[in-house]
Swiss-Prot record:
It comes from Photorhabdus luminescens. It is an enzyme of class 6 (ligase). Acyl-protein synthetase activates tetradecanoic acid. It is a component of the fatty acid reductase complex responsible for converting tetradecanoic acid to the aldehyde which serves as substrate in the luciferase-catalyzed reaction. One of its GO terms (molecular function) is ATP binding. This is Long-chain-fatty-acid--luciferin-component ligase. Its EC number is 6.2.1.19. Keywords: ATP-binding, Ligase, Luminescence, Nucleotide-binding. The gene is luxE. One of its GO terms (biological process) is bioluminescence. Pathway: Lipid metabolism; fatty acid reduction for biolumincescence. InterPro entries: LuxE. Belongs to the LuxE family. It catalyses: a long-chain fatty acid + L-cysteinyl-[protein] + ATP = an S-(long-chain fatty acyl)-L-cysteinyl-[protein] + AMP + diphosphate.
Amino acid sequence: MTSYVDKQEITASSEIDDLIFSSDPLVCAYDEQEKIRKKLVLDAFRHHYKHCQEYRHYCQAHKVDDNITEIDDIPVFPTSVFKFTRLLTSNENEIESWFTSSGTNGLKSQVPRDRL
């Protein structure tokens, strides 16, 4: 049988890559999975807070700084923001993928995905 899928080996280059591509998630107990999830989400929040001025201002307007300790305290942009603003945490040449909405209401959202 011929495979039409181009396969490639992915090398884990970060803690999250290791979890996604290398680890067996069922080896960790649920509590351990939640601990890892919390750490990675808070790390990502702090990265975006530090490197995206618009997001930092949004957080500050909601009286949130980068010292939060709970995921539920992370302010989330309304999805409509991505229809009208180009938000970047890194340089455009570091963007790995652009995700685009269907544009059902006539205007498509574009969300960049950098390495983090």
